[in-house]
């Protein structure tokens, strides 16, 4: 008899294991392990001129840009066309260590998120871009102009990266990428990159606004002299936002770097990369950062998902001034549109319609929508509410809670970020949980079938609803497996598993009055609905 029960237990265990495996879905769940992931570091995707390479290192000169590739090993994964997510790091557009401990494609946060995407079956790419600007200049034109130029060149690099990725997928596709689905994710400064990448599409957008013009005659950001009213960006020198035009005159090859030498007495300083390959993307995501100007956004831009700290001192949540920290001082740069403003524009314009976020009733979606700072209950923005520990010192707020770094770094833990890996990983959990359902919707628009969790061919009835004492949840045509209930802030108030019945009674008498989100898992899928306690 004992052996019989042991055998039955083993069979049940195997069935449960089989159910858990079959319930996992590629692109939604982590279907690969860390051991299954291959990393290809330091792959060059493009080259271009940088005027901020120090003379001690041979600058100004042409430099390479790198990306690290994270993907399920092709000996394990049989999928031949895998969607791509390209990540861009933070660092205030300055070399690592000048403004923060972050500043390249190997930053902890972008590496962690790249690995998480790869374990879900994506090809994830962490990319560098050109850095450098006169962040602490006392000349407003030089400070503001070089900052705009830094964003501009980073967009050119990002487009070169997308073209390199798509071009590789179209030619030999050794990394088995889908050229028809590429998403971008920017962290901190990388958020400025993804915003500008998605919205900047004509010269007038950087030439016409007064804030992007010289306020006085004097030295220009590319050398020489300029007049008041001239635009900071000169496409004859640096090319357009796609990285075309303004071509440099090549005079030879550096014996040190092996890269082209250019004639700095000539006007052009741009080197086009992967010309002719399309650079359009399917989705952009920002964790912090801002939109350089709200007028950049227009109908037809790619859908956008945003994450932002409400009290971010360095990049505004609504609208406001960009502030950059250098050596304990803060330098104001330019007024921009924050993530909340950008999300509202993208929602109203219809760009985010494809994400269908208003139908999502999971705890993270409900919490994001109902956040008290989210004026208008905008979709597709997740707000973090951390306050600075001292309201008189707003610059101490933790505006990048997903970042952590080497504890031995000279710029180590502070009140602004305690540099606790476990805490940062928890914030990344939230970022992934909010991103994945929306990423799935964008993928479905490109021909995938992701996240089809809710199946409409069975009915769930909750009665009475509103409820004051108890309610009965009944299913028609299916068996209820579990029920979970959370409030509008995403806090769990009720969980019951292993039900295996077509109905279940829930006592609501002790609950506070309000609206609750009920998630019912059945043997034919999941339904999410509302329950009101009156």
PLM region spans:
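C-terminal tail/sorting-segment detector
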Residues: 23, 513-534
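N-terminal cap/lid segment of alpha/beta-hydrolase-fold proteins
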Residues: 25-80
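Gly/Ser-rich "nucleophile elbow"/oxyanion-hole loop immediately N-terminal to the catalytic nucleophile
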Residues: 80, 143-156, 160-188, 200-209, ...
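Short beta-strand element of the alpha/beta-hydrolase
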Residues: 80-91
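Cap/lid segment of the alpha/beta-hydrolase catalytic domain
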Residues: 92-109, 122-152
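Active-site-adjacent alpha-helix of alpha/beta-hydrolase-fold enzymes
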Residues: 104, 108, 302-388
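C-terminal catalytic histidine-bearing segment of alpha/beta-hydrolase fold enzymes
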Residues: 294, 347-449
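Residue-level detector of functionally pivotal "anchor" positions at catalytic/ligand-binding pockets or at interdomain
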Residues: 441-463, 469, 476-478, 491-492
């Amino acid at each position: 008899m004992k052996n019989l029960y042991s055998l039955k237990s083993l069979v049940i265990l195997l069935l449960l294991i089989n159910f858990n495996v079959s319930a996992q879905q590629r692109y939604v769940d982590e279907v690969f392990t860390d051991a299954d992931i291959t990393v290809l570091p330091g792959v060059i995707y493009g080259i271009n001129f940088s005027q901020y390479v120090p003379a001690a290192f041979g600058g100004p000169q042409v430099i390479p840009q790198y990306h690290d590739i994270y993907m399920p090993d092709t000996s394990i994964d049989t999928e031949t066309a895998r969607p791509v997510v390209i990540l861009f790091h933070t660092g205030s557009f300055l070399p690592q260590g000048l403004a923060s401990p972050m500043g390249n494609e190997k930053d902890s946060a972008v590496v962690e998120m790249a690995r998480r995407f790869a374990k879900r079956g994506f090809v994830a790419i962490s990319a560098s871009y050109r850095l450098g600007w006169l962040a602490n200049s006392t000349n407003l034109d030089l400070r503001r102009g070089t900052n705009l130029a830094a964003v501009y060149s980073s967009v050119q690099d990002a487009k070169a990266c997308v073209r390199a990725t798509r071009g590789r997928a179209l030619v030999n596709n050794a990394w088995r990428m889908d050229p028809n689905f590429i998403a971008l994710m920017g962290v901190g400064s990388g958020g400025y990159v993804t915003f500008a990448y998605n919205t900047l599409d004509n010269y007038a957008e950087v030439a016409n606004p007064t804030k992007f013009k010289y306020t006085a005659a004097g030295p220009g950001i590319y050398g020489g002299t300029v007049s008041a009213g001239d635009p900071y960006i000169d496409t004859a020198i640096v090319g357009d936002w796609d990285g075309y035009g303004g071509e440099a005159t090549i005079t030879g090859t550096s014996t040190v770097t092996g890269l082209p030498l250019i004639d700095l007495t000539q006007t052009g300083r741009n080197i086009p990369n992967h010309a002719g390959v399309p650079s359009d993307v399917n989705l952009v995501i920002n964790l912090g950062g801002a939109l350089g100007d709200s007028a950049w956004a227009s109908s037809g831009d790619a859908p956008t998902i945003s994450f932002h700290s409400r009290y971010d001192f360095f990049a505004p949540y609504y609208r406001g001034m960009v502030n950059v920290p250098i050596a304990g001082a803060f330098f104001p740069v330019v007024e921009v549109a924050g993530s909340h403003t950008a999300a509202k524009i993208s929602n109203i314009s219809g760009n985010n319609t494809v994400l269908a976020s208003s139908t999502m009733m999971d705890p993270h979606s409900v919490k994001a929508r109902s956040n008290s700072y989210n004026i208008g209950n905008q979709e597709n923005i997740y707000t973090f509410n951390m306050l600075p520990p001292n309201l008189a010192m707003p610059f101490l707020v933790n505006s990048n809670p997903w970042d952590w770094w080497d504890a031995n770094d000279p710029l180590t833990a502070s009140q602004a970020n305690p540099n606790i890996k476990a805490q940062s990983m928890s914030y990344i959990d939230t970022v992934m949980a909010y991103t994945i359902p929306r990423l799935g919707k964008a993928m479905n628009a490109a021909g995938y079938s992701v996240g089809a969790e809710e199946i409409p061919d069975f009915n769930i009835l909750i009665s009475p609803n509103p409820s004051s004492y108890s309610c009965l949840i009944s299913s028609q045509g299916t068996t209820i497996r579990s029920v979970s209930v959370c409030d509008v802030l995403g806090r769990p108030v009720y969980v019951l598993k292993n039900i295996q019945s077509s109905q279940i009674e829930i006592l609501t008498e002790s609950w506070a009055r309000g609206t609750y989100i009920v998630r019912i898992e059945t043997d034919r899928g999941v339904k999410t609905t509302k329950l009101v306690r009156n």
